[in-house]
Amino acid sequence: MPQQLLITPATEATWVKLKEVSLWEDVTKMFGGEALLSHDANGTQQESLADGTTPGTPAAGSHDGATPGTTATGSHDEATPGTPAAGSHDGETPGIPAAGSHDGETPGTPTAGSHDGVTPGTTAAGSQESLTFKDIAVDLSQEEWGQLAPAYQDLYREVMLENYRNLVSVAGYQLSKPTVISQLEKGEGPCMAESQGPEDPILDVKNKLETKESTAEDDISVKLDHGITRGRLIEDDIVCSPLKKASSYSDTLESHRATCGKGTRRAIWTHKKKRQEGNKLENPESSNVILEQKHRKHKPARKRNKYKLDSIDHPVSCMRARRYPCNVCEKMFKQPIHLVEHMRTHTGEKPFRCKECGRAFSQSASLNTHQRIHTGEKPFACEECGKAFRHRSSLNQHHRTHTGEKPFTCDKCQKAFSQNISLVQHLRTHSGEKPFSCSECGKPFRQIRHLSEHVRIHTGEKPYKCTSCCKTFSHRAYLTHHQRIHTGERPYKCKECGKAFRQRIHLSNHRTVHTGVKAYECNRCGKAYRHDSSFKKHQRHHTGEKPYECTECGKSFSYNSSLSRHQKIHRRNTFRDDPGHENKRQL
């Protein structure tokens, strides 16, 4: 954990040591006396604390004879981290200017030829001021901006605006708002390369690439701060580099670090550019290359799940929403568990099985809902009438009976329905489609429930039983109609004469008495009938159909009434053949 907290260049470590002695001691204790590693201009590592020494102080046994804060006489290869070598023009970083510079002084060390009288241990005026916006900006040209994917454009805008806000609020940045910030706030793309002239940071980077400098200033990495003074940043804030986010609490950093993956578990990190990367900056081939060079994004790691599906593991804070694609239908999911559940629709896997009936389900939620059938639980109750339902969707559909809402309308006849399934079934009346056929007799039906009811004719199943007389029925509607005999209920009343009926079909047949309409006409003889049942009986005269067969002798009849009269003959004959019948007559 301590090793992952801070990795900083030697110049920055020296600055902290000189300006914040107590803070440097805390950092040393945090690392348990181990060395703070940093990268020099040649890409090698230097040890600042390995021998118990601090930056700016030579190790024991040094022959340079240099005192803290000074440069060894005649030494051009090794200089104390706090003071650059004489004549050196490389390795200069903001806040650590070269010897002889009059623009700023090294913290704790006066510049050569300085007339300000700054003594060691003090800082020249202005040396602690915040970095400028150019130091924290990630510059993109208009061409490079256009090559970025929309997701990376949003990421760039978010980072730039956050950096600028931190610069203004913490460092007291009072200059006029940069043009690029105004453009990003309006949702436009940056035009920094075209608008900032010779001081343009992107041109400065290209010039450095052309001269192939190999110093710390060549590093186009994430800056160490958001425009905050370096001492305040290291003292008060902990930084996570992927988005340069600062947190005042270590536990916040830990939670953020957990989402960034193993590749970004360092608070501050630095990338040394390679010389061949200059060509990539000038001729970017893809938005990913540009973003890696401009913002130094970590390379996404590929993960494999049990279905061998690839998912890119971006930090949650770096990408606004993680997406997991299905390789079969290309549907996207936010959570990997949702993708796993979706894949079962392709594989047919049903790992969740009901212990009561053995029925299997692909999702545990479906199993929980199914188990309410066995337990009788109905957790969703209507506030209007108190009726309870097993499913929330059933309750929502029921609400429409109270509100009268019918959102589903037929385009052909403008008839409205409260449920979508009712509209689908209604559309089959226009198309004539009957997709459900009986496997026994081949009779087609528009609805599957009608087929299920019809199959009971062949099987003889009668699952609906009357609790009053124990009579059984093959259809629920038949049981409902029968129960009205016991209750005396007649819910269908004629508006003309006030006569009431138990069934709707009886009311419809009765209305023809008042209207005189005979809607059913025979195509062969032209005879008309008011009722559909009478019309079907008449057609049997022409077809010769005799669907009613006697179980005693096998004789068939066209009408059910004819069969009933015939069966009375068999009952009379049985009564006469009974031996007890003669004894009763004699008595």
Curated annotation (Swiss-Prot):
Keyword Transferase appears in the UniProt entry: no
Q: Where in the cell is it found?
A: Nucleus
Gene Ontology molecular function terms on file: DNA binding; zinc ion binding
Q: Which residue windows does the record flag with biased composition (Basic and acidic residues)?
A: 574-587
Q: Where is this region: Disordered?
A: 42-128, 564-587
Q: Give the matching PROSITE patterns.
A: KRAB (PS50805), ZINC_FINGER_C2H2_1 (PS00028), ZINC_FINGER_C2H2_2 (PS50157)
InterPro entries in the record: KRAB (IPR001909), KRAB_dom_sf (IPR036051), Znf_C2H2_sf (IPR036236), Znf_C2H2_type (IPR013087)
* GO CC terms in record: nucleus
Q: Give the signal peptide, or none.
A: none
SMART domains of this UniProt entry?
KRAB, ZnF_C2H2
Q: What superkingdom heads the lineage?
A: Eukaryota
Q: What UniProt keywords apply to this chain's record, in alphabetical order?
A: DNA-binding, Lipid metabolism, Metal-binding, Nucleus, Repeat, Transcription, Transcription regulation, Zinc, Zinc-finger
KRAB domain ranges (all copies) = 76-147
Q: Do you know which PANTHER family this protein is assigned to?
A: ZINC FINGER AND BTB DOMAIN-CONTAINING, ZINC FINGER PROTEIN 606
Family of the protein in this entry: Belongs to the krueppel C2H2-type zinc-finger protein family.
- What is this protein's name? Zinc finger protein 69
Q: Gene name?
A: Zfp69
